[in-house]
Protein backbone atom coordinates (compact mmCIF):
# COMPACT_ATOMS: atom_id res chain seq x y z
CA UNK A 1 0.00 0.00 0.00
CA UNK A 2 1.12 3.53 -0.75
CA UNK A 3 0.95 6.25 1.90
CA UNK A 4 -0.91 9.35 0.70
CA UNK A 5 -1.35 11.27 3.95
CA UNK A 6 0.44 11.34 7.30
CA UNK A 7 -0.29 13.71 10.18
CA UNK A 8 1.46 13.97 13.55
CA UNK A 9 0.77 15.92 16.74
CA UNK A 10 -2.73 17.15 15.94
CA UNK A 11 -3.69 19.34 18.90
CA UNK A 12 -6.74 21.61 18.68
CA UNK A 13 -8.29 23.45 21.62
CA UNK A 14 -11.58 25.33 21.74
CA UNK A 15 -12.69 27.33 24.78
CA UNK A 16 -10.23 25.48 27.00
CA UNK A 17 -11.34 22.02 25.81
CA UNK A 18 -9.14 19.59 23.89
CA UNK A 19 -11.13 19.02 20.69
CA UNK A 20 -8.34 17.02 19.06
CA UNK A 21 -5.38 15.37 20.77
CA UNK A 22 -4.02 12.88 18.23
CA UNK A 23 -0.43 11.69 18.06
CA UNK A 24 -0.43 10.25 14.54
CA UNK A 25 -2.75 9.37 11.67
CA UNK A 26 -1.99 7.68 8.36
CA UNK A 27 -4.12 7.26 5.24
CA UNK A 28 -3.11 4.83 2.49
CA UNK A 29 -4.41 4.38 -1.02
CA UNK A 30 -7.42 2.06 -1.12
CA UNK A 31 -8.26 2.92 2.51
CA UNK A 32 -12.01 3.11 3.13
CA UNK A 33 -12.40 4.88 6.47
CA UNK A 34 -15.58 5.96 8.25
CA UNK A 35 -15.08 8.74 10.81
CA UNK A 36 -17.72 8.50 13.55
CA UNK A 37 -18.40 10.29 16.83
CA UNK A 38 -20.94 12.46 18.58
CA UNK A 39 -21.84 15.90 17.24
CA UNK A 40 -19.26 18.36 18.51
CA UNK A 41 -16.57 15.69 18.86
CA UNK A 42 -14.44 17.44 16.22
CA UNK A 43 -14.98 15.29 13.11
CA UNK A 44 -15.31 18.21 10.67
CA UNK A 45 -12.42 19.98 12.39
CA UNK A 46 -10.22 16.93 11.81
CA UNK A 47 -11.08 16.91 8.10
CA UNK A 48 -10.14 20.60 7.88
CA UNK A 49 -6.78 19.84 9.53
CA UNK A 50 -6.08 16.96 7.13
CA UNK A 51 -6.99 19.17 4.17
CA UNK A 52 -4.70 21.96 5.37
CA UNK A 53 -7.53 24.45 5.91
CA UNK A 54 -6.66 24.52 9.61
CA UNK A 55 -3.05 24.31 10.82
CA UNK A 56 -2.69 23.68 14.56
CA UNK A 57 0.60 24.80 16.16
CA UNK A 58 3.18 22.01 16.10
CA UNK A 59 1.18 19.81 13.73
CA UNK A 60 3.28 18.04 11.10
CA UNK A 61 1.46 17.19 7.87
CA UNK A 62 2.76 15.22 4.91
CA UNK A 63 0.41 15.00 1.91
CA UNK A 64 1.75 12.68 -0.78
CA UNK A 65 -1.25 12.86 -3.11
CA UNK A 66 -4.04 15.14 -4.35
CA UNK A 67 -7.20 15.20 -2.24
CA UNK A 68 -10.74 16.24 -3.13
CA UNK A 69 -13.21 17.47 -0.54
CA UNK A 70 -16.97 16.97 -0.38
CA UNK A 71 -17.99 19.64 2.16
CA UNK A 72 -21.17 19.96 4.14
CA UNK A 73 -24.03 21.52 2.22
CA UNK A 74 -23.57 25.16 3.18
CA UNK A 75 -19.99 25.16 1.83
CA UNK A 76 -20.86 24.13 -1.74
CA UNK A 77 -19.56 26.29 -4.58
CA UNK A 78 -19.60 26.01 -8.34
CA UNK A 79 -16.33 24.99 -9.98
CA UNK A 80 -15.26 24.94 -13.59
CA UNK A 81 -14.34 21.25 -13.89
CA UNK A 82 -17.33 18.90 -13.97
CA UNK A 83 -18.29 15.62 -15.55
CA UNK A 84 -21.70 16.65 -16.89
CA UNK A 85 -22.70 13.04 -17.60
CA UNK A 86 -22.09 12.22 -13.95
CA UNK A 87 -23.92 15.37 -12.85
CA UNK A 88 -26.91 14.21 -14.87
CA UNK A 89 -26.85 10.70 -13.40
CA UNK A 90 -26.74 12.18 -9.92
CA UNK A 91 -29.94 14.02 -10.76
CA UNK A 92 -28.76 17.63 -11.01
CA UNK A 93 -30.92 19.06 -13.76
CA UNK A 94 -29.51 22.60 -13.73
CA UNK A 95 -26.47 24.39 -12.36
CA UNK A 96 -27.94 27.60 -10.91
CA UNK A 97 -26.72 27.53 -7.33
CA UNK A 98 -29.33 30.09 -6.29
CA UNK A 99 -32.30 27.91 -7.22
CA UNK A 100 -30.95 24.45 -6.37
CA UNK A 101 -32.65 22.26 -3.81
CA UNK A 102 -30.61 20.76 -0.98
CA UNK A 103 -30.53 17.43 -2.75
CA UNK A 104 -29.32 18.98 -6.01
CA UNK A 105 -26.55 20.90 -4.24
CA UNK A 106 -25.41 17.72 -2.50
CA UNK A 107 -25.37 15.80 -5.79
CA UNK A 108 -23.40 18.61 -7.43
CA UNK A 109 -20.60 18.65 -4.87
CA UNK A 110 -20.34 14.85 -5.11
CA UNK A 111 -20.05 15.09 -8.89
CA UNK A 112 -17.34 17.74 -8.53
CA UNK A 113 -15.25 15.47 -6.29
CA UNK A 114 -15.70 12.37 -8.44
CA UNK A 115 -14.84 14.35 -11.60
CA UNK A 116 -11.40 15.30 -10.28
CA UNK A 117 -8.39 13.04 -10.82
CA UNK A 118 -7.33 12.67 -7.19
CA UNK A 119 -5.68 10.15 -4.89
CA UNK A 120 -8.26 10.48 -2.15
CA UNK A 121 -11.63 11.98 -1.22
CA UNK A 122 -12.53 13.45 2.16
CA UNK A 123 -16.31 13.71 2.54
CA UNK A 124 -18.38 15.40 5.24
CA UNK A 125 -21.90 13.93 5.32
CA UNK A 126 -22.11 13.21 1.56
CA UNK A 127 -25.55 11.54 1.85
CA UNK A 128 -27.19 14.66 3.28
CA UNK A 129 -30.33 15.60 1.32
CA UNK A 130 -29.98 12.61 -1.03
CA UNK A 131 -32.95 10.31 -1.50
CA UNK A 132 -32.54 6.54 -1.41
CA UNK A 133 -31.90 6.34 -5.16
CA UNK A 134 -29.23 9.03 -4.93
CA UNK A 135 -27.55 7.29 -1.98
CA UNK A 136 -27.49 3.96 -3.81
CA UNK A 137 -26.00 5.62 -6.91
CA UNK A 138 -23.35 7.34 -4.77
CA UNK A 139 -22.46 4.00 -3.15
CA UNK A 140 -21.97 2.50 -6.60
CA UNK A 141 -19.73 5.39 -7.71
CA UNK A 142 -17.58 5.27 -4.57
CA UNK A 143 -17.14 1.50 -4.87
CA UNK A 144 -15.55 2.08 -8.28
CA UNK A 145 -13.39 4.96 -6.99
CA UNK A 146 -9.82 3.64 -6.77
CA UNK A 147 -8.39 6.20 -4.35
CA UNK A 148 -8.63 6.50 -0.58
CA UNK A 149 -11.85 7.56 1.11
CA UNK A 150 -12.31 9.20 4.51
CA UNK A 151 -15.97 9.93 5.16
CA UNK A 152 -18.10 11.38 7.95
CA UNK A 153 -21.63 10.00 7.78
CA UNK A 154 -24.59 9.26 10.05
CA UNK A 155 -26.00 6.84 7.44
CA UNK A 156 -25.14 3.42 8.87
CA UNK A 157 -26.18 1.53 5.72
CA UNK A 158 -23.89 3.78 3.65
CA UNK A 159 -20.99 3.10 6.04
CA UNK A 160 -21.67 -0.64 5.93
CA UNK A 161 -21.52 -0.62 2.14
CA UNK A 162 -18.50 1.67 1.70
CA UNK A 163 -15.97 1.46 4.54
CA UNK A 164 -13.76 -1.32 5.88
CA UNK A 165 -12.27 0.65 8.76
CA UNK A 166 -13.80 2.90 11.43
CA UNK A 167 -12.08 5.80 13.16
CA UNK A 168 -13.97 6.59 16.35
CA UNK A 169 -13.34 10.14 17.58
CA UNK A 170 -14.03 10.50 21.29
CA UNK A 171 -12.53 12.87 23.87
CA UNK A 172 -10.15 14.14 21.20
CA UNK A 173 -8.64 10.70 20.53
CA UNK A 174 -8.96 8.34 17.56
CA UNK A 175 -9.56 4.64 18.16
CA UNK A 176 -9.31 2.40 15.09
CA UNK A 177 -11.62 -0.55 14.43
CA UNK A 178 -11.37 -2.90 11.46
CA UNK A 179 -14.51 -3.66 9.46
CA UNK A 180 -17.62 -1.73 8.48
CA UNK A 181 -20.04 0.00 10.84
CA UNK A 182 -21.87 -3.20 11.83
CA UNK A 183 -18.50 -4.83 12.61
CA UNK A 184 -17.63 -1.77 14.69
CA UNK A 185 -20.90 -2.09 16.64
CA UNK A 186 -20.16 -5.73 17.41
CA UNK A 187 -16.68 -4.83 18.63
CA UNK A 188 -18.10 -2.01 20.78
CA UNK A 189 -20.61 -4.43 22.30
CA UNK A 190 -17.80 -6.86 23.12
CA UNK A 191 -15.91 -3.97 24.71
CA UNK A 192 -19.00 -3.04 26.72
CA UNK A 193 -19.45 -6.63 27.93
CA UNK A 194 -15.77 -6.86 28.85
CA UNK A 195 -15.96 -3.54 30.67
CA UNK A 196 -19.12 -4.66 32.48
CA UNK A 197 -17.41 -7.88 33.63
CA UNK A 198 -14.32 -5.93 34.71
CA UNK A 199 -16.51 -3.41 36.56
CA UNK A 200 -18.48 -6.15 38.35
CA UNK A 201 -15.22 -7.85 39.35
CA UNK A 202 -13.86 -4.50 40.57
CA UNK A 203 -17.00 -3.78 42.64
CA UNK A 204 -16.97 -7.28 44.15
CA UNK A 205 -13.25 -7.14 45.04
CA UNK A 206 -13.55 -3.64 46.49
CA UNK A 207 -16.54 -4.72 48.60
CA UNK A 208 -14.63 -7.82 49.81
CA UNK A 209 -11.60 -5.76 50.85
CA UNK A 210 -13.79 -3.13 52.52
CA UNK A 211 -15.55 -5.84 54.54
CA UNK A 212 -12.22 -7.38 55.51
CA UNK A 213 -10.79 -3.98 56.54
CA UNK A 214 -13.88 -3.20 58.59
CA UNK A 215 -13.60 -6.62 60.27
CA UNK A 216 -9.97 -5.88 61.23
CA UNK A 217 -10.97 -2.47 62.62
CA UNK A 218 -13.82 -4.09 64.53
CA UNK A 219 -11.42 -6.65 66.03
CA UNK A 220 -9.00 -3.85 66.98
CA UNK A 221 -11.81 -1.94 68.73
CA UNK A 222 -12.80 -5.06 70.68
CA UNK A 223 -9.20 -5.54 71.80
CA UNK A 224 -9.03 -1.86 72.77
CA UNK A 225 -12.25 -2.14 74.80
CA UNK A 226 -10.95 -5.31 76.48
CA UNK A 227 -7.73 -3.53 77.38
CA UNK A 228 -9.64 -0.62 78.94
CA UNK A 229 -11.77 -3.07 80.94
CA UNK A 230 -8.81 -5.02 82.23
CA UNK A 231 -6.92 -1.85 83.22
CA UNK A 232 -9.64 -1.04 85.76
CA UNK A 233 -9.06 -4.30 87.66
CA UNK A 234 -6.58 -4.41 90.50
CA UNK A 235 -3.61 -6.75 90.22
CA UNK A 236 -1.26 -7.75 93.04
CA UNK A 237 1.52 -8.51 90.55
CA UNK A 238 2.40 -5.34 88.61
CA UNK A 239 4.71 -7.14 86.20
CA UNK A 240 2.02 -9.60 85.16
CA UNK A 241 -0.44 -6.78 84.56
CA UNK A 242 2.01 -4.82 82.42
CA UNK A 243 2.92 -7.85 80.34
CA UNK A 244 -0.75 -8.55 79.74
CA UNK A 245 -1.42 -4.93 78.62
CA UNK A 246 1.58 -5.05 76.27
CA UNK A 247 0.24 -8.22 74.68
CA UNK A 248 -3.19 -6.63 74.16
CA UNK A 249 -1.65 -3.45 72.71
CA UNK A 250 0.40 -5.47 70.27
CA UNK A 251 -2.68 -7.33 69.02
CA UNK A 252 -4.62 -4.07 68.66
CA UNK A 253 -1.83 -2.48 66.63
CA UNK A 254 -1.57 -5.59 64.47
CA UNK A 255 -5.30 -5.41 63.64
CA UNK A 256 -5.14 -1.69 62.76
CA UNK A 257 -2.07 -2.29 60.58
CA UNK A 258 -3.89 -5.12 58.80
CA UNK A 259 -6.84 -2.76 58.18
CA UNK A 260 -4.49 -0.10 56.76
CA UNK A 261 -2.87 -2.69 54.49
CA UNK A 262 -6.31 -3.60 53.15
CA UNK A 263 -7.11 0.10 52.62
CA UNK A 264 -3.92 0.45 50.57
CA UNK A 265 -5.01 -2.55 48.48
CA UNK A 266 -8.39 -0.86 47.90
CA UNK A 267 -6.62 2.32 46.75
CA UNK A 268 -4.36 0.24 44.49
CA UNK A 269 -7.43 -1.11 42.69
CA UNK A 270 -7.74 2.29 41.05
CA UNK A 271 -10.99 3.32 39.39
CA UNK A 272 -12.90 1.26 36.85
CA UNK A 273 -15.64 3.14 35.00
CA UNK A 274 -19.08 1.59 34.76
CA UNK A 275 -20.07 0.84 31.14
CA UNK A 276 -22.60 3.13 29.52
CA UNK A 277 -25.94 1.38 29.81
CA UNK A 278 -28.89 1.69 27.43
CA UNK A 279 -31.35 4.07 29.03
CA UNK A 280 -34.94 3.01 28.65
CA UNK A 281 -38.23 4.61 29.53
CA UNK A 282 -41.64 3.05 29.84
CA UNK A 283 -43.96 5.25 27.79
CA UNK A 284 -47.51 5.59 28.98
CA UNK A 285 -50.70 7.28 27.81
CA UNK A 286 -53.58 8.51 29.88
CA UNK A 287 -57.03 6.98 29.37
CA UNK A 288 -58.12 10.28 27.84
CA UNK A 289 -55.62 9.80 24.99
CA UNK A 290 -56.52 6.18 24.19
CA UNK A 291 -57.66 5.54 20.62
CA UNK A 292 -59.89 2.62 19.68
CA UNK A 293 -60.32 3.13 15.93
CA UNK A 294 -58.16 0.40 14.28
CA UNK A 295 -57.22 2.93 11.56
CA UNK A 296 -57.08 6.44 13.08
CA UNK A 297 -55.91 8.01 9.78
CA UNK A 298 -57.35 6.96 6.41
CA UNK A 299 -56.90 8.45 2.95
CA UNK A 300 -59.48 7.48 0.33
CA UNK A 301 -58.82 8.32 -3.34
CA UNK A 302 -57.00 11.55 -2.58
CA UNK A 303 -55.79 13.94 -5.28
CA UNK A 304 -53.22 16.72 -5.22
CA UNK A 305 -51.93 19.00 -7.97
CA UNK A 306 -49.19 21.65 -7.79
CA UNK A 307 -49.31 23.91 -10.83
CA UNK A 308 -49.27 21.50 -13.75
CA UNK A 309 -47.76 18.64 -11.71
CA UNK A 310 -50.04 15.97 -10.26
CA UNK A 311 -48.60 14.40 -7.11
CA UNK A 312 -51.53 12.11 -6.25
CA UNK A 313 -54.33 10.68 -8.38
CA UNK A 314 -56.99 8.62 -6.59
CA UNK A 315 -54.39 7.44 -4.05
CA UNK A 316 -55.47 5.60 -0.91
CA UNK A 317 -53.82 4.52 2.34
CA UNK A 318 -54.63 3.65 5.96
CA UNK A 319 -52.55 4.02 9.11
CA UNK A 320 -53.02 1.14 11.60
CA UNK A 321 -53.42 1.98 15.29
CA UNK A 322 -50.14 1.68 17.21
CA UNK A 323 -48.08 1.04 14.07
CA UNK A 324 -44.76 2.62 13.12
CA UNK A 325 -45.46 3.66 9.53
CA UNK A 326 -42.69 4.81 7.17
CA UNK A 327 -43.34 6.93 4.08
CA UNK A 328 -40.68 6.43 1.40
CA UNK A 329 -40.01 7.65 -2.12
CA UNK A 330 -37.71 9.95 -4.07
CA UNK A 331 -37.18 13.65 -3.40
CA UNK A 332 -40.06 15.79 -4.64
CA UNK A 333 -42.41 12.80 -4.96
CA UNK A 334 -44.94 14.11 -2.41
CA UNK A 335 -44.02 12.70 1.01
CA UNK A 336 -44.03 16.02 2.88
CA UNK A 337 -47.09 17.09 0.89
CA UNK A 338 -48.96 14.01 2.11
CA UNK A 339 -48.08 14.88 5.71
CA UNK A 340 -49.36 18.42 5.20
CA UNK A 341 -52.58 17.05 3.72
CA UNK A 342 -53.06 14.92 6.85
CA UNK A 343 -52.32 17.84 9.18
CA UNK A 344 -54.74 20.07 7.26
CA UNK A 345 -57.48 17.39 7.14
CA UNK A 346 -57.75 17.84 3.38
CA UNK A 347 -60.45 16.28 1.27
CA UNK A 348 -60.40 12.48 1.22
CA UNK A 349 -58.53 12.17 4.54
CA UNK A 350 -60.37 10.95 7.66
CA UNK A 351 -58.84 11.32 11.12
CA UNK A 352 -60.17 9.92 14.40
CA UNK A 353 -61.86 12.71 16.43
CA UNK A 354 -59.80 11.75 19.50
CA UNK A 355 -56.49 11.97 17.65
CA UNK A 356 -53.90 14.28 19.24
CA UNK A 357 -51.16 14.75 16.65
CA UNK A 358 -47.61 15.86 17.39
CA UNK A 359 -45.62 17.07 14.38
CA UNK A 360 -41.86 17.32 13.83
CA UNK A 361 -40.86 19.34 10.76
CA UNK A 362 -37.57 19.07 8.85
CA UNK A 363 -36.59 22.67 9.54
CA UNK A 364 -38.41 23.39 12.78
CA UNK A 365 -35.30 24.06 14.85
CA UNK A 366 -34.97 27.82 15.33
CA UNK A 367 -35.49 28.93 18.94
CA UNK A 368 -34.60 32.23 20.61
CA UNK A 369 -36.35 31.55 23.93
CA UNK A 370 -34.58 32.15 27.26
CA UNK A 371 -36.52 29.22 28.71
CA UNK A 372 -34.15 26.49 29.89
CA UNK A 373 -34.15 22.88 28.70
CA UNK A 374 -35.95 21.38 31.70
CA UNK A 375 -38.61 24.13 31.77
CA UNK A 376 -39.25 23.54 28.08
CA UNK A 377 -39.58 19.78 28.60
CA UNK A 378 -41.86 20.05 31.64
CA UNK A 379 -44.47 22.19 29.92
CA UNK A 380 -47.49 20.10 28.85
CA UNK A 381 -45.73 16.90 29.95
CA UNK A 382 -47.07 14.17 32.25
CA UNK A 383 -43.66 12.62 33.01
CA UNK A 384 -41.64 13.34 36.14
CA UNK A 385 -38.23 15.02 36.21
CA UNK A 386 -36.36 11.72 36.56
CA UNK A 387 -38.05 10.30 33.44
CA UNK A 388 -37.39 13.50 31.49
CA UNK A 389 -33.72 13.40 32.51
CA UNK A 390 -33.50 9.78 31.37
CA UNK A 391 -34.82 10.56 27.88
CA UNK A 392 -32.62 13.66 27.56
CA UNK A 393 -29.57 11.64 28.65
CA UNK A 394 -30.34 8.95 26.07
CA UNK A 395 -30.38 11.70 23.41
CA UNK A 396 -26.94 12.91 24.46
CA UNK A 397 -27.75 15.76 26.86
CA UNK A 398 -25.33 16.04 29.79
CA UNK A 399 -26.22 17.00 33.35
CA UNK A 400 -25.02 20.58 32.84
CA UNK A 401 -27.12 20.94 29.66
CA UNK A 402 -30.41 20.72 31.58
CA UNK A 403 -30.21 24.31 32.84
CA UNK A 404 -29.07 25.81 29.52
CA UNK A 405 -31.21 28.39 27.76
CA UNK A 406 -32.74 27.27 24.46
CA UNK A 407 -31.17 30.30 22.80
CA UNK A 408 -27.62 28.92 23.26
CA UNK A 409 -28.33 25.40 21.95
CA UNK A 410 -27.01 24.33 18.56
CA UNK A 411 -29.36 23.35 15.73
CA UNK A 412 -28.62 19.67 16.37
CA UNK A 413 -29.34 20.04 20.09
CA UNK A 414 -32.65 21.78 19.37
CA UNK A 415 -33.65 18.95 17.03
CA UNK A 416 -32.91 16.35 19.73
CA UNK A 417 -34.81 18.41 22.29
CA UNK A 418 -37.88 18.78 20.04
CA UNK A 419 -37.91 15.05 19.32
CA UNK A 420 -37.64 14.22 23.03
CA UNK A 421 -40.43 16.67 23.89
CA UNK A 422 -42.74 15.29 21.23
CA UNK A 423 -42.19 11.69 22.35
CA UNK A 424 -43.09 12.71 25.92
CA UNK A 425 -45.93 15.04 24.94
CA UNK A 426 -49.68 14.65 25.29
CA UNK A 427 -50.15 13.01 21.90
CA UNK A 428 -51.33 9.66 20.60
CA UNK A 429 -50.10 10.07 17.00
CA UNK A 430 -46.68 11.42 16.04
CA UNK A 431 -45.79 12.59 12.53
CA UNK A 432 -42.07 13.03 11.83
CA UNK A 433 -40.55 14.50 8.68
CA UNK A 434 -36.96 13.21 8.38
CA UNK A 435 -36.29 12.92 12.14
CA UNK A 436 -32.80 11.49 11.55
CA UNK A 437 -31.49 14.55 9.69
CA UNK A 438 -28.68 16.33 11.57
CA UNK A 439 -28.54 13.67 14.31
CA UNK A 440 -25.25 11.98 15.15
CA UNK A 441 -25.27 8.18 15.18
CA UNK A 442 -25.50 7.77 19.00
CA UNK A 443 -28.55 10.07 19.09
CA UNK A 444 -30.06 8.32 16.08
CA UNK A 445 -29.69 4.92 17.72
CA UNK A 446 -31.26 6.30 20.91
CA UNK A 447 -34.14 7.74 18.85
CA UNK A 448 -34.73 4.31 17.31
CA UNK A 449 -35.12 2.76 20.76
CA UNK A 450 -37.52 5.52 21.85
CA UNK A 451 -39.59 5.22 18.65
CA UNK A 452 -39.86 1.43 19.01
CA UNK A 453 -40.93 1.68 22.65
CA UNK A 454 -43.42 4.49 22.04
CA UNK A 455 -46.94 3.21 22.72
CA UNK A 456 -48.78 5.43 20.24
CA UNK A 457 -48.85 5.57 16.43
CA UNK A 458 -45.92 7.05 14.48
CA UNK A 459 -45.87 8.13 10.83
CA UNK A 460 -42.40 9.12 9.65
CA UNK A 461 -40.52 10.03 6.48
CA UNK A 462 -36.98 8.74 6.13
CA UNK A 463 -34.27 7.96 3.59
CA UNK A 464 -32.28 6.17 6.32
CA UNK A 465 -32.37 2.48 5.43
CA UNK A 466 -31.31 1.29 8.90
CA UNK A 467 -33.92 3.46 10.64
CA UNK A 468 -36.52 2.04 8.26
CA UNK A 469 -35.45 -1.56 8.92
CA UNK A 470 -35.18 -1.16 12.69
CA UNK A 471 -38.39 0.79 13.41
CA UNK A 472 -41.03 0.50 10.67
CA UNK A 473 -43.57 -2.31 10.72
CA UNK A 474 -45.57 -0.74 7.86
CA UNK A 475 -43.92 0.85 4.81
CA UNK A 476 -45.65 2.92 2.12
CA UNK A 477 -43.81 3.93 -1.05
CA UNK A 478 -45.06 6.95 -2.98
CA UNK A 479 -44.60 6.23 -6.68
CA UNK A 480 -46.49 6.94 -9.89
CA UNK A 481 -48.95 9.23 -8.05
CA UNK A 482 -50.03 6.36 -5.79
CA UNK A 483 -49.32 5.41 -2.17
CA UNK A 484 -48.23 1.79 -2.43
CA UNK A 485 -48.13 -0.56 0.56
CA UNK A 486 -44.77 -2.38 0.50
CA UNK A 487 -45.20 -4.30 3.76
Swiss-Prot record:
Changing residue 241 to A: Does not restore growth, no change in MIC for ERY. Its main location: cytoplasm. Keywords: Antibiotic resistance, ATP-binding, Coiled coil, Cytoplasm, Nucleotide-binding, Protein biosynthesis, Repeat, RNA-binding, Translation regulation, tRNA-binding. Residues 185-233 form a coiled coil. CDD domains: ABCF_EF-3 (cd03221). Probably binds to 70S ribosomes, contacting the P-site. NCBIfam families: ABCF_Msr_all (NF000168), ribo_prot_ABC_F (NF000355). This is Probable macrolide resistance translation factor MsrD. It comes from Streptococcus pneumoniae.
Amino acid sequence: MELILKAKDIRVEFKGRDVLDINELEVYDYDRIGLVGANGAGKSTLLRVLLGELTPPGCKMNRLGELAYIPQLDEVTLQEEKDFALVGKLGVEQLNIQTMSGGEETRLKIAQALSAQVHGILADEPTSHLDREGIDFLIGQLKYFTGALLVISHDRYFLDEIVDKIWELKDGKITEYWGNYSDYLRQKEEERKSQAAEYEQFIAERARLERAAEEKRKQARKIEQKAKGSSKKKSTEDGGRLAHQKSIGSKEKKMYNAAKTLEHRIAALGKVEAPEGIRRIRFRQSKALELHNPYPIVGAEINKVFGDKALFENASFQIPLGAKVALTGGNGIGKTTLIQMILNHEEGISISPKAKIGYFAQNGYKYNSNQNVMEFMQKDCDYNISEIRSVLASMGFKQNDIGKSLSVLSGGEIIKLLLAKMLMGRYNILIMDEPSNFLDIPSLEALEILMKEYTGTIVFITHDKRLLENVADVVYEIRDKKINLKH
